Amino acid sequence: MKLGIVGLPNVGVVPVPDERLEVLSEMNHSAKTVPAVIEFVDIAGLVKGASKGEGLGNQFLSNIREVDAIVHVVRCFEDSNIVHVDGSIDPLRDIETINLELIFSDIEILERRIAKSVKAARADKKLAGEVDMLNRLKGFLEEGHLAKNFELENEDEEAWFSEYNLLTSKPVIYAANVAEEDLADDGASNEQVSKVREFAKGEDSEVFVICAQIEQEIAELDEDEKKMFLEDMDLEESGLEKLIKASYRLLGLISYLTSGEQETKAWTITRGTKAPQAAGKIHTDFERGFIRAEVVSYENLVENGGYNGAKEKGLVRSEGKEYVVQDGDVVLFRFNV
């Protein structure tokens, strides 16, 4: 999974926290433990005028089209020592600035696609429908709307739309960046955070509160120091952990687990994935030669002291190709190629 992040640089590739891994690893004396990871693409170069070549410009915008979602960190704190580029604190203005740059970039993509499709439609009349949709979509964006709110009229339009990979079609998470003292009540008393929450509600996006300054401090600590730091701050989890959980919810992701002497590992899949496709995350041979999956829930495995104990109780199931893998399933795939 890859997320573009605006306003919180140097995050990079981060492990997905999952306490279940350590328990399974200890139970099976695994040589190594491998968490799932999320890659955050730093899009700090996204500034007013980027679509016209300012900042890192258009090449930069094209580079972030492959992200699955966008995380927009918006400033919700006052500090005279940290000057805002626009001279005042207004998170809704900042959101609009970024959205406009993404819209302008998407319009440019559509203009190129229209020119290409008009030519192709001369030879293939079926493509006239795409040209019509492209013009409707372009007009929609020119009115200041986001592509994700555009109404698609049929399956053909859905297929065409998915090919364009428009930035404004991607889901968004808003991270309200607050001062340290606003963390205690999760930003409830911060007027700017309230504005962001109200705005996000209108577009069915999620908002969480973060203090970037504290995140920078946490990033320099080892795991034990981090736990102590969070306890001292009376926080249950770091902002980065909040972000990871929000990302999983937004994209409908879950993790299944594999565990043995060699390694214990978490694998990220989309909710609703069937067993053969989940197996394919490990290796394409697993999907191609899938026979069955031996499955036990994490809870049943731990409660019965391990795989053998769970099997004796009849809690290890043999599942076929139609089985939908669940979050926390501990799976052993049987395959033959």
What are these regions (language model features)?
Residues 42, 333-334:
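Conserved metal-binding segment of the jelly-roll/cupin
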Residues 1-7, 118-324, 336:
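C-terminal-of-GTPase-core extension/linker across diverse P-loop GTPases
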Residues 1-83, 92, 99, 111-112, ...:
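Conserved G1/Walker A P-loop phosphate-binding module
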Residues 75, 335-336:
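Short, surface-exposed secondary-structure boundary micro-motifs
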Residues 57-163, 174, 208:
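Long, charged N-terminal accessory/stalk domains
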Residues 20-21, 45-47, 75-81, 88-90, ...:
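Conserved nucleotide-binding/hydrolysis micro-motifs of P-loop NTPases
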Residues 18-21, 31-40, 54-68, 92-95, ...:
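Amphipathic alpha-helical transducer elements in NTP-driven molecular machines
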Residues 326-331:
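Structural motif
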